[in-house]
């Protein structure tokens, strides 16, 4: 890696009709204390105030710039267009409701210079606006973790085992939770059809898998630099929600991605939002790139069908969405001579009752849930500061530091109660009795 003390960073923000949330995203970008930084907002034909929001932010901070592919090209092509505008250095991609934590870019630059690697990941916290996933807003923080070097071969083998790219905290996808050098991005482009980087229907998880295969190892930082945001306009929520407006948004999205079928081993089916299926599509697509050096074990299609069905049974999908995914899985099963087995799986599997996400304050083995509405965290900018401060507190508040704080407090209290010397006697300060007229 170039040892320049301030390597160039570009944050691309492909977006469409998210002006209400984008303004808070850009506030988190503008607060960065790093000069060699460019924020590129690529607008895919928004009909709201997106351009005005970006240009107003750009007048205040020249690091922020508005670009557009010139029409409604769809998410995938908008990402590719934005990536085309990036100058040599490092790149991070975000959505129009994601953000950067305070001092995020400068801290990330220090980490990359320390490791000397061109690919890195971190545990990004997650913020949900009120009314997005639930009535109240929510901030989710990961428990403190240690930084480490990850072997790419181990990471890729784990993707085959779990078939759940999005749950892998070490995934180096440069969408919100990772960063990549433009040299690695260009390396993938040279292997890809038509010189594109984004060759799968959706752009996020593929980047982590294909880039991991380009290097022997990459860095994982226990410190977060960015934050995921979820708003009512988020694409993933559009498919899980069952109201008519959400269905319309997801139908519009499918129209754009239908031109890019999944891998031939997935029967060339249209895009599926099932994480299991997407993980397999990313793996197979990367594997087939000419000269791609990544390696992973053979994928069991029977296991993929089983895990996909379990995901579909989780109670988050509405009835018509379930039917669509079952049809896709049935075609994939038929491609591999597993249709009878798959239909037996369907007959023997029971769906969970419809459920809502966890709401309120809570804690699990690896995450902390904070009710943002209760604590006055209203938007992504607020959440970014809260995540940064709470993350620092969690990292530094070790059992040892807590014990030292308690011991110091006790020692101070004991010193304050200790009896000292008595006051000097009257002879040393009295001027004698004075008469009163």
Regions found by a protein language model. Give the residues of each.
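Nucleotide-sugar donor-binding/catalytic module of glycosyltransferases
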Residues: 1-246, 403
């Amino acid at each position: 890696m170039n040892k320049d003390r301030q390597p160039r960073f570009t944050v691309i923000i492909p977006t469409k009709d998210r002006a209400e949330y984008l303004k808070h995203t850009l506030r988190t970008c503008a607060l960065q204390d790093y000069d060699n930084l460019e924020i590129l907002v690529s607008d895919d034909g928004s009909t709201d105030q997106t351009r005005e929001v970006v240009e107003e932010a750009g007048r205040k901070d020249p690091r922020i710039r508005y670009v557009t592919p010139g029409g409604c090209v769809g998410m995938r092509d908008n990402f590719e267009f934005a990536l085309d505008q990036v100058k040599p250095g490092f790149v991070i991609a975000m959505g129009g409701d994601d953000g950067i934590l305070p001092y995020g870019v400068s801290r990330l630059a220090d980490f990359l210079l320390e490791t000397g690697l061109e690919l890195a990941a971190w545990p990004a916290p997650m913020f949900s606006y009120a009314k997005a996933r639930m009535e109240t807003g929510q901030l989710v923080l990961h428990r403190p973790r240690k930084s480490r070097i990850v072997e790419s071969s181990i990471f890729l083998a784990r993707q085959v085992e779990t078939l759940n790219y999005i749950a892998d905290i070490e995934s180096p996808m440069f969408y919100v939770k990772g960063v990549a050098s433009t040299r690695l991005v260009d390396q993938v482009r040279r292997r890809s059809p038509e010189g594109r980087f984004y060759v799968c229907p959706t752009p996020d998880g593929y980047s982590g898998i294909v880039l991991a295969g380009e290097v022997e190892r990459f860095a994982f930082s226990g410190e977060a630099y960015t934050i995921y945001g979820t708003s009512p306009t988020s694409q993933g929520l559009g498919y899980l929600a069952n109201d008519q407006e959400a269905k319309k948004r997801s139908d519009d999205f499918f129209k754009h991605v239908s031109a890019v079928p999944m891998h031939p081993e997935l029967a060339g089916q249209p895009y599926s939002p099932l994480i299991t299926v997407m993980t397999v599509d990313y793996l197979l697509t990367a594997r087939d790139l000419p000269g791609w050096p990544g390696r992973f074990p053979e994928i069991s299609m029977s296991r993929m069908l089983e895990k996909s069905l379990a995901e579909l049974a989780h109670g988050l999908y509405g009835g018509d969405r379930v039917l669509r995914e079952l049809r896709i899985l049935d075609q994939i099963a038929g491609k591999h001579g597993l249709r009878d087995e798959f239909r037996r799986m369907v007959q023997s599997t029971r769906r969970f009752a419809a459920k809502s996400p966890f709401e309120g304050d809570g804690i699990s083995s690896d995450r902390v849930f904070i009710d943002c509405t209760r604590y006055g965290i209203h938007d992504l900018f607020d959440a970014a500061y809260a995540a940064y401060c709470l993350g620092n507190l969690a990292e530094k508040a070790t059992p040892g530091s807590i014990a030292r704080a308690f011991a110091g407090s006790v020692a101070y209290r004991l010193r304050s109660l200790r009896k000292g010397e008595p006051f000097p006697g009257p002879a040393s300060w009295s001027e004698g009795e004075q008469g009163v007229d």
